[in-house]
A protein has these predicted regions:
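Conserved small/polar residues in nucleotide/adenosyl-binding loops
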Residues: 170-176
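Ser/Thr/Gly-rich low-complexity blocks that favor extended beta-strand/coil architectures
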Residues: 2-3
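Short, flexible domain-boundary/linker segments around small modular repeats
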Residues: 27-56, 84-108, 136-166
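Single, functionally critical "micro-switch" positions that shape active/binding sites
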Residues: 25, 82, 174
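Fold-core signature of tandem repeat domains
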Residues: 7-10, 14, 18-23, 30, ...
Length: 176
């Protein structure tokens, strides 16, 4: 497994091409390794075009699309952060090219129970919600989610902006 620091060291040993099978590092470092790709076969540089790549820091849809061009090997994302629609778009990238199946997810725009369920179907990692808006029953359902090992992660609401819809005067009077 190679990191950017390892790759720079390996590349300094030769004027030929270094071929990588596995790379695990932050997005910016993997991108920097990709920039070392030689312009012709066998030339000085680093070839990761067939490498299995794991990106360790949170990435957006734009970064996921960029990373998908780094290699014909599988790109594994450990963490993703973006709007709901963009997270769904990341998951729509064919899973033999790029996967977020076990990624920690942070959704940055407003979601509800239905959207949280969609995200839980896309990853076994924990999901952090920045904003949620739904009725009391659905919010309670989201709050009740727990880790189901190998199936779904927890849904984290501790830092969320929460909006409760469909609150009636009767509900408010009942709690006085």
């Amino acid at each position: 497994i190679s990191t950017f620091a390892d790759v720079i060291k390996l590349n300094s040993y030769t004027n030929g091409e270094v071929t990588l099978d596995k790379v695990t590092d932050k997005f910016a470092n993997v991108q920097a390794i990709h920039r070392l790709t030689p312009t012709e076969d066998g030339a000085d540089g680093v070839d990761l075009t067939a490498a299995l790549i794991t990106i360790t820091d949170p990435v957006s849809l734009d970064q996921a699309n960029t990373a998908n061009d780094f290699s014909d090997g599988l790109i594994t994302l450990n963490s993703v952060i973006d709007s709901f629609d963009n997270l769904i778009a990341i998951d729509a990238i064919p899973s033999d090219q790029l996967t977020m199946a076990n990624a920690a997810v942070q959704v940055t725009d407003e979601v509800n129970l239905s959207k949280v369920n969609d995200l839980r179907a896309d990853t076994t990692g924990n999901i952090t919600v920045d904003e949620i808006k739904d009725n009391k029953v659905n919010l309670a359902a989201v709050n009740a989610f727990v880790v189901e090992e190998g199936v779904a992660g927890d849904v984290i609401l501790s830092e969320s902006d929460i909006t409760v819809t469909a609150v009636s005067y009767t509900h408010l009077r009942a709690h006085e």
